């Protein structure tokens, strides 16, 4: 068996090797991807991503990694900035998003946590028991495993020190595949080891009694005053919990932009302390402020801007930041700042390419965590970015010069690992333990093949050697430190090729992804991530995908992003919760709508099918073609037509006569959400003529409700018409009109994506009638399934497993739930049962391709692509030398050749499919048009899922043998891939046209 086969067998759906998962796990808060697309060849893209659910899963994955000598990397939330949690040599990435269990030992005041739980989650559990965290990293949404592995410090470190000071025990899977429990001094083996000595699977986190937190802020005019006050805090041992210092520029910007309670243009010291200590802390603060000329006022700490990631977000909103975390003794602060000022410009004057500012946290052992920021005007995808990244190195050098260290080592500063682990991180040196030596020796003895997180903490000898290029580049930066600006001006700039290439696929989404600071706040609120805790299903993962894609292009010279990958990262239900928490204010949901529309536009439209709805007198008597009241059934009910029959029976019970619009009608919903305006308007005009003079449209699906109530109202004005009708969901009409008793019956009500506008009203009326409603939010995936994404089954199963029997507002969702074995009905059917109406069954005569047919289409399409290209290999070989002119110019040369290739593919595949369609048609009563549509749909699916750069590899090998002169193979590959993608719609059109005459 191969690595892939063993992992798939062990983990099933929790093993992934698709492009989306791999790329979304190749980025963190720092600049590693930028190093890659600046030319340093570090393989940051994992080959496989696994989501363990248990310690047993982790042990099994480790054993596979050891067996095949494949590197393994643990991943929490990717909020670190030193590359700790992303690969340096591909391999297996362990994402702990599905190991998040937390329990509280109240007696010993310990939270027992799995590695994927966030500090915020642990704090919530603790507070429910009257306890809370003693300290946590500045990223509240980072994970327990990540915080311990990096031995972070952050909020509360003034009183409680590093994370290692607040860890009671850790259980790891070591490089022999054994489960080991570490306590006391032995924690030196794992705390700060960055996953190089073992994979954390459980930890005990120390807690304290809960107390409300008070905040006072002291503002000072000068740096000198602030530095003296920092010394006073240590000399007087003021019993605060956390102390944070904001520089003048940071204070001004956050105060003005986010209304934070800070004094603009001043140094602000925010002091946090338990309210129970207010009588001890406040008098001392007031005395210090009076002595050193400070002004005291009430502060606040609960805003997102309170943490370091918040500061980065605030500043990032106006330009790209280069920042560095360092640990120094507090007596070295002035020396550090003076040295940085010589290198970076004026302190407190943060402007593009000039000046810097700092954010400082006090740690209990007289250690300061200094976060220095400088701003640059260069785009992160500019070829000159490497020169600005050198400023990061210069800052690092200044920390080391004053006897300090980086906060973390990661892939960047192996030579300074001892400073970090033994000199500045005093948790273990105070116990007489040389942590650096403990980790180094254990690593050498137990992991000689460098399987565990290679390239981190220590210089690699076997694998991940690309990271060794970083110190060489750092040394160059230090050598030319005063010539960086000159070198930058003289060097050719412009966007890196990888970004230009990826933007062809993702458009504006690619631009905005560069603004993401990887704070992971969007992850915490994302309902789809809560349903399916996998990285691509959270906005952070979606944005990380882009930077990972740019890096992978730069690593391998080509990359094709199939539509299925775009559908996967954009296929959420656009609830907008992420928009509300994003500190950089990226319009995430709007971007995802636009991105999803790029795929939706390409999906072949299904043929109109009119199902018979009037099967008896009861249903037929409801229909009145002259009625001003319309029941819109529409094509969305094709997947669940029994709901339409039941709806007619309900309307009959209510005594209504309505005009019924059947299943062949299309409201234009898919065109509306896809941004296909012209097509939508065309359908809208047709429908408005059909429902002219109507005063009420009764809808059965939330999708049609949204289309008529929002889109028609807006778009009708563009065509000089007005949609005067009222739009009402049938469920709401029934609840308003019919009297019955709920008898305290419990119902799990699924609120479908496009029903949010009326869902609260429905819940209110159900409650008034005596039902106990449990609200279920989360997309079933029924509509997303039409957009090629793989989320649909996962989401439906996740909802069903959590809630059991479901009543949903969406007929499509009900059908989707049932298709994966979940008991589900629509609210319409539920209400019909309460009215004594027998719900209907409807057997739809349909046609679906079996797996063998799908496999055949895929095989023949790939075969035809290669055969058609191979037939043109000689002429393409003759043009290969022109590849030196670049992709865009070379495309112009070979475009006629690729057009001919596309035409040949279309003719060949059409011929093969025509005979199959004729054969299938003779075996079923289904209309041939439906059969043809299924074949065309499957061709479209294959085209939307294949990665053309991989498909082309055999052809490129053949081409190589035909070309005797020098040429740029990357240019040739990318030109052919791009042209094939651009002519995909032409290929579909050729096949559709050829098959229509079958």
Where are the regions that the model predicts?
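N-terminal flexible segment immediately upstream of the FAD-binding catalytic core
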Residues: 1-59, 63, 79-109, 248-258, ...
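Short connector loops at secondary-structure junctions
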Residues: 411-415, 656-682, 702-707, 733-736, ...
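Short, flexible loop segments at boundaries between secondary-structure elements
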Residues: 721-741, 778-779, 822-854
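FAD-binding subdomain of flavoenzyme oxidoreductases
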Residues: 101-103, 113-115, 119-244, 452, ...
